[in-house]
Amino acid sequence: MSSALPDVSVTDLTHSLSPLQWVGMQGIDLPVRIEEPTYQRELHARADVQVDLPAPHVKGIHMSRLYCLLDAWGQAAAVSPASLFALLQEMIDSHQDCGSRNARLRLDFDLLVRRPALVTEGLSGWKSYSVHVLATKVGGALNLSIEVRIGYSSTCPCSAALSRQLIEDGFLRTFKDQPLLEASAVAQWLRSNASLATPHSQRSEARVRVTVPSDAPDLGLLALIDQVEGALRTPVQTAVKRADEQAFAALNGQNLMFVEDAARRIQASLRGYRDSQVHVRHLESLHPHDASAWSAPQASAPDQQESFATGNER
């Protein structure tokens, strides 16, 4: 019995002599460490790793090599631009016999962050943010982008104005024959009738993608999330009591916004980031469809905006 195991990727020649842009694996389970100034945690991620296969005579790549490199990287290093780019180079170096010159890595994970209640001291809860990291080395050029998804509440300005008009009409009908009003009477009427009409609001989602500088010490995930939530001012909450719910209602009333307003707010907050792209979606409670808006500093790249807008990625 022969001790040598067959390797058809080496011994079998391909019948179609054509290069392949990317070959590799998707959805590899992996623990990753995120280490940022205000956040340190090990998380469960799913990874995609690929290299190019430019040599048409080579039947296939060595997927086990990519897997082992990824596995060792996940155990040894925190996720950072430096560690990601080092892994990409190792992936390319491991496939010199395939002529590989390019590599890419994608990580998908949820960043779990503890958030305090708006008002109640000592009350907090966990909030999850979906994160996508894409690192590439193509033609010698390194590129790293991060994408985060952030939930927030949006209240329609038009609906708020229509609601205020109905409340105003109700007030005038009630007090039209009373030229002098006591504050207590007005307050009592408002307690019973201020919700005569209410504006529609809904849970909404922002997707934000930015390029991370290659010399950055970390990905800056929490800093980006905090920046966007600060611009929107109505991020969805975790643990709440009545005082927190009231404070949240006040924030929504003070920050009425169309989907266009939300996209512009976020884009304005990203001026310090390179190549930022924004997609916001309001899951309308008035309609069975969503309202959406997209924003990017350079509107001259519609192909990139379209790929970002499809939302078909895992």
From Swiss-Prot:
Site feature location: May be catalytically important: 156
Keywords assigned by UniProt, alphabetized: Hydrolase
The keyword Amino-acid biosynthesis is assigned to this record: no
Keyword hit for Membrane: no
Biased composition (Low complexity): 291-305
Reaction catalysed by this enzyme: GTP + H2O = 7,8-dihydroneopterin 3'-triphosphate + formate + H(+)
Involved pathway(s): Cofactor biosynthesis; 7,8-dihydroneopterin triphosphate biosynthesis; 7,8-dihydroneopterin triphosphate from GTP: step 1/1
Major enzyme class: hydrolase
InterPro entries (UniProt xref): GTP_cyclohydrolase_FolE2 (IPR022838), GTP_cyclohydrolase_FolE2/MptA (IPR003801)
Region of interest called Disordered, as start-end residue ranges on this chain: 290-314
One GO biological process term: tetrahydrofolate biosynthetic process
GO MF terms held by the record: GTP cyclohydrolase I activity
E.C. number: 3.5.4.16
Superkingdom assignment: Bacteria
Family the entry assigns: Belongs to the GTP cyclohydrolase IV family.
Function: Converts GTP to 7,8-dihydroneopterin triphosphate.
Record-given protein name: GTP cyclohydrolase FolE2
Taxonomic lineage of the native organism: Bacteria, Pseudomonadati, Pseudomonadota, Gammaproteobacteria, Pseudomonadales
